[in-house]
Amino acid sequence: MRSASPRPSVTGALFSLMLVLGACSGGADGTPAGSTSRDDCARVEDGVITITADDLAFSAPCMVATAGEAFTIHFENLEAQVHNVSLYTDSSKGNELMRGETITGPDAEVDYAVEALEAGEYYFDCMVHPAMSGTLFVEA
């Protein structure tokens, strides 16, 4: 009687390799997997970052500001929903840095003053719709 020896499946091995390579690879622009390219970010211009809300999403997945410089977030709500922008040290929301006033659109806008921040990554979201979120990069 012959004992059956386990044989590795070529298909299974290739599938496993594809999963590992996919999980470890970054974006085509060199950004790590799961991160956002800063090319897509809203940036400070003359002390103001403009970001909008429409179709339950922010117009940019991230914002970029300069360390040590206060700035304003000019927020435009383009839809008939209640939205705001709030800023935290991280996604746990344990340390709130700025809670923006909620506004109802369409075509409503407000300016939020943000005090100077240290270089680093911060988290922002809409308190009413937490899936609307992004990263604020503060660069030295």
Describe each model-derived feature in a short phrase.
Residues 20-23:
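C-terminal motif of bacterial Sec signal peptides marking the signal peptidase cleavage site
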Residues 2-14:
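Bacterial N-terminal signal peptides that target proteins for export
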Residues 55, 75-77, 128:
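Non-cytosolic beta-sheet module surface loops
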Residues 25-28, 43, 57, 104-140:
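Extracellular/periplasmic metallocenter environments
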Residues 26-39:
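Bacterial Sec signal peptide processing site at the extreme N-terminus
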Residues 61-81, 85-86, 110-124:
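Beta-strand cores of secreted/periplasmic/IMS beta-sandwich domains, seen most often
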Residues 41-70:
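N-terminal edge beta-strand
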Residues 80-106:
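Histidine- and aromatic-enriched segments that form or immediately flank copper-ligand environments
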